[in-house]
Amino acid sequence: MREFKRTDRVADQLQQELAVLIQREIKDPRLGMVTVSSVKVSRDLGYADIYITLLGENDAARIDENLKVLRHARGFLRSQIANRIKLRHVPELRFHYDESVVRGQRLSSLIDEAVADDRRRHEDDDEDEVR
């Protein structure tokens, strides 16, 4: 059984708190439906890289706008986290767009296309054998 490192526990707690704070406390109308997909904390707990996704948004301009809003609010978010989590030092927050979801969707669609092509070829081969 693997023991969780402190950085993993802090990352999980940050992810939960940030998800709530972003949804409930940031009132900027430019902010879309943001999901905190993962958080990675440096070994010294100095930095936290927060990876976000946007529901239904693939436009680069909208993604950049949402990242700007979050980066502008990072001081507020850090202060709120300091009130909610007992840490000697709250990590510096760095926001990034998580492209893994988009890549996963793209790969899934490519696999679906390949399977459909394979089925069509298989059906064509079966028809040729019947003739």
From Swiss-Prot:
The answer to whether UniProt assigns keyword Heme to this entry is no
List the InterPro entries. KH_dom-like_a/b (IPR015946), RbfA (IPR000238), RbfA_dom_sf (IPR023799), Ribosome-bd_factorA_CS (IPR020053)
Q: Which GO terms describe its cellular component?
A: cytosol
- Classify the main location: cytoplasm
Q: Which UniProt keywords apply?
A: Cytoplasm, Ribosome biogenesis
**Location(s) in or outside the cell:** Cytoplasm
GO terms for biological process, alphabetical: maturation of SSU-rRNA
Q: Does the keyword Disulfide bond apply?
A: no
| Example of a GO MF term | ribosomal small subunit binding
Q: Which HAMAP family match?
A: RbfA
Which NCBIfam families does the annotation name? rbfA
Query: How is the quaternary structure described?
Result: Monomer. Binds 30S ribosomal subunits, but not 50S ribosomal subunits or 70S ribosomes.
Summarizing the function annotation, the protein's role is:
One of several proteins that assist in the late maturation steps of the functional core of the 30S ribosomal subunit. Associates with free 30S ribosomal subunits (but not with 30S subunits that are part of 70S ribosomes or polysomes). Required for efficient processing of 16S rRNA. May interact with the 5'-terminal helix region of 16S rRNA.
Q: Describe the family membership recorded for this protein in Swiss-Prot or TrEMBL.
A: Belongs to the RbfA family.
**Record-given protein name:** Ribosome-binding factor A
Q: Which organism is it from?
A: Chromohalobacter salexigens (strain ATCC BAA-138 / DSM 3043 / CIP 106854 / NCIMB 13768 / 1H11)
